[in-house]
């Protein structure tokens, strides 16, 4: 499957029915999801690998990994409603994915894998500052390789946070197209600069 084909397929994934701002539940844009997954694919980190989507939401990254030939794909989230949507999305696209209700803070409930893919919260809400840290910690605990979407300019923070535990071996700039989802949003569409980081466990 080519990059454009993957993007078109992922555009069929439904988003959150009732997103929660406190959890920063925003649907990962198909273009950005496809970019992350295809970079992982060409690096040999998807095909015939076991892949985990941490904080999978409605499943777009997990489903994309399955479409690219992962041997086994699991997605985990704490929101049962999002997981139900994820299961519907996977069925729609014929993707074999197992979705699990689990908190990233409970790594003992999450099986090890070859590759983690994730779009963790950016910590944009006051009650959610540093919300990406448990995701990074969990990823390093369960997988040797991680691909994550972070706010642009996060590389230095992530490097410092994982010092001694892992290294950033790849960085790709991207854009998160954020549609109006909540009453406090002032624009119908906002383009947020992001970066996709490849993290390898030390």
Language-model region placement:
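Class I S-adenosyl-L-methionine-dependent methyltransferase catalytic core
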Residues: 1-202
């Amino acid at each position: 499957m080519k990059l454009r084909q993957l993007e078109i397929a992922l555009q069929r994934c439904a988003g959150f029915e009732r997103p929660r701002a406190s959890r920063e539940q925003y649907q990962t844009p198909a273009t950005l999801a496809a970019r992350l997954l295809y970079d992982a694919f060409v690096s040999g980190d998807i095909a015939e690998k076991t892949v985990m989507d941490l904080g999978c939401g409605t499943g777009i990254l997990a489903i994309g990994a399955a479409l690219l030939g992962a041997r086994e794909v699991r997605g985990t989230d704490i929101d049962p409603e999002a997981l139900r949507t994820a299961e519907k999305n996977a069925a729609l696209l014929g993707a074999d994915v197992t979705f699990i209700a689990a908190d990233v803070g409970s790594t003992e409930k999450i099986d090890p894998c070859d590759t983690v893919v994730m779009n963790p919260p950016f910590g944009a809400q006051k009650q959610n500052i540093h919300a990406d840290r448990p995701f990074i910690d969990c990823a390093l605990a369960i997988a040797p390789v991680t691909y994550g979407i972070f706010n642009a300019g996060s590389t230095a923070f992530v490097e410092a946070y994982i010092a001694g535990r892992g290294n950033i071996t790849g960085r790709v700039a991207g854009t998160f197209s954020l549609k109006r989802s909540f009453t406090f949003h002032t624009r119908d569409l906002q383009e947020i600069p992001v970066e996709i980081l490849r993290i390898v466990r030390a």
